[in-house]
Amino acid sequence: MESSPSSPQPTQSDPLAVFPQRTLEPADIAVLVLYFLFVLAVGLWSTVKTRRDTVKGYFLAGGDMVWWPVGASLFASNVGSGHFVGLAGSGAAAGLSVTAYEFNGIFSVLMLAWIFLPIYIAGQVTTMPEYLRKRFGGSRIPITLAVLYLFIYIFTKISVDMYAGAIFIQQSLHLNLYLAIVGLLAITALYTIAGGLAAVIYTDALQTLIMLIGALTLMGYSFAAVGGMEGLKEKYFLALASNRSGNSSCGLPREDAFHIFRDPLTSDLPWPGILFGMSIPSLWYWCTDQVIVQRTLAAKNLSHAKGGSLMAAYLKVLPLFIMVFPGMVSRVLFPDQVACADPEICQKVCSNPAGCSDIAYPKLVLELLPMGLRGLMMAVMVAALMSSLTSIFNSASTIFTMDLWNHLRPRASERELMIVGRVFVLLLVLVSILWIPVVQASQGGQLFIYIQSISSYLQPPVAVVFIMGCFWKRTNEKGAFSGLILGLLLGLVRLVLDFIYPQPRCDQPDERPAVVRDVHYLYFSMILSSVTLVTVSTVSWCTAPPTQEMVSRLTWFTRHDPIVLKEQVPSATPVPVTVSQNGTPEASSTNIQFEIVQENTSKTHSCDMTKKQSKVVKTILWLCGMESKGKEEPPSRADPVIVSLEEIPLVKTLLDINLIVCISCAIFLWGYFA
């Protein structure tokens, strides 16, 4: 068994034998403490700096973010601890084919800024369900989608990041899992609740820098340990566990490990599925997912949003080099643990009989890095976990507040929405903690593939509805709802079948039904997209077309339509979410006047009460962005909403040139590694 010369030889009887019983050195602890102080300082600075007492200020960071924090936040929101653990684990187990998801994301994030975002800006939307409410009318589709988004966030994103973070924290630090994660969640929730999206974006920018420094450092150590890329290509195919059964194919490296495009029938990621089946969930994630779109909507203008997307697209090249290749290096250096093939030994090594490839990245951190740098990489993993959780907390809070709560209480004041949004973050924290035992009990042998298979069952119908709504004016509510429900039902059936008939281990016969065994999840994504597309088109053709209000400024072809009424009306109050669905904005002005009068009276009462408020109450109100400022409030409710799609010609030209360069780089990478 190959191991670091400085580490003690682990014994197979110890369930944590894969990691030496190291304790953090003082330098490691100092780095971790400095990191947490940095994050809290940046979070509190952005909390003081930005306006948090309006819907736009809290949920969209005031709409004045410049390109670089937007780009950093896009990358940090996407690359969580699940990426570090999952991508490196998939690289160790099956080679670099999983990189296709990252390269696919390059095109999708650029499509967001150049194609989808102009439609969202023209339509003046805060959330994705709100766009569908304006585009199709009614409440069936937005409510269904809001619930689905929250389901996906809580039970896939939070659970996956929790699992990945748990692997790193528990296995490497030997800390109490609940204590560590509760502490992380407490810090994460504090600046999310206090600062809103601005705090999340600024801390994401800091954490992106830390992630890149730490991950690039580990990449250098990894390649040095195996003799560079040539050494990796030679040694990877020899990386076999010494205790592997000689007559078994289990645990063997794949012959196509260094290729992205693989056999269309027998491989783990068939190339037609990569080209077509993978693109639909990728479009959902980058172009219609609240977590991602919310960051670009917070940009100052369309040019800054494009700049941020370009920055994220360039950064998406890095996961292959800082995650996938190091995962493959980990298999070369530690084959007995990372490449274990015997279920009993895997159970002893990492408490997972399905395989231990997911320990590849933390194994590298603890074995290769010297004192101090080990603490830096601990901070990197914590940064990845926290940046993902803050993104999910803020975006889920936005959806719940603006789409579900606003539907239940259409006359809710701005103050009430601010309180509800922050309380919902606390509920998410509670759900996250309660979800930890479920994550611990789940099988994580193929963490990243698990994420993508779930995505392929639930996301294609939603993506098709958005695409049809944005690019076909004839699409109506009945067609979109029919396609969405049929697609989700089919996806849920396949999801349930996958849970009932889990994939057998390598040494077991595959007795699953043919629809589960023979239809790859990427092929199922293609089938699901086609069924949804045909349903939406057919029902829309056979029913009445949408009204002009539901099309104007809400599709690609109508985004430049003239503005019918004053555009400041929607931004003055959250009420237009319910008003616009009926296409009768004439009645909105009286509603807004009523709401402002109502809130002014409530604020007068609150001002009278400030003399009796304790310091604790004042602190809580400050955290919630509702400190008293006098009776002249609220002029802040009339924040301007960006509706202009105009760009400075020189800036637009530079961005378009960068777009061509970025796409060319992506095509080259596809071709080189295909």
Swiss-Prot record:
Residues 49-56, 124-140, 202-208, 294-308, 398-418, 468-479, 540-653 are cytoplasmic. GO terms for biological process: apoptotic process; myo-inositol transport. One of its GO terms (molecular function) is myo-inositol transmembrane transporter activity. MI transport activity inhibited by D-chiro-inositol (DCI), phlorizin (Pz) and sodium (Na(+)). Insulin increases D-chiro-inositol uptake. Residues 1-27, 78-102, 162-180, 230-272, 330-374, 440-446, 501-518 are extracellular. Pfam families: SSF. It catalyses: myo-inositol(out) + 2 Na(+)(out) = myo-inositol(in) + 2 Na(+)(in); 1D-chiro-inositol(out) + 2 Na(+)(out) = 1D-chiro-inositol(in) + 2 Na(+)(in); D-glucose(out) + 2 Na(+)(out) = D-glucose(in) + 2 Na(+)(in); D-xylose(out) + 2 Na(+)(out) = D-xylose(in) + 2 Na(+)(in). The keyword Cell membrane applies. It comes from Sus scrofa. This is Sodium/myo-inositol cotransporter 2. The chain crosses the membrane at residues 28-48, 57-77, 103-123, 141-161, 181-201, 209-229, 273-293, 309-329, 375-397, 419-439, 447-467, 480-500, 519-539, 654-674. Involved in the sodium-dependent cotransport of myo-inositol (MI) with a Na(+):MI stoichiometry of 2:1. Exclusively responsible for apical MI transport and absorption in intestine. Can also transport D-chiro-inositol (DCI) but not L-fucose. Exhibits stereospecific cotransport of both D-glucose and D-xylose. May induce apoptosis through the TNF-alpha, PDCD1 pathway. May play a role in the regulation of MI concentration in serum, involving reabsorption in at least the proximal tubule of the kidney. InterPro entries: Na/Glc_symporter_sf, Na/solute_symporter.
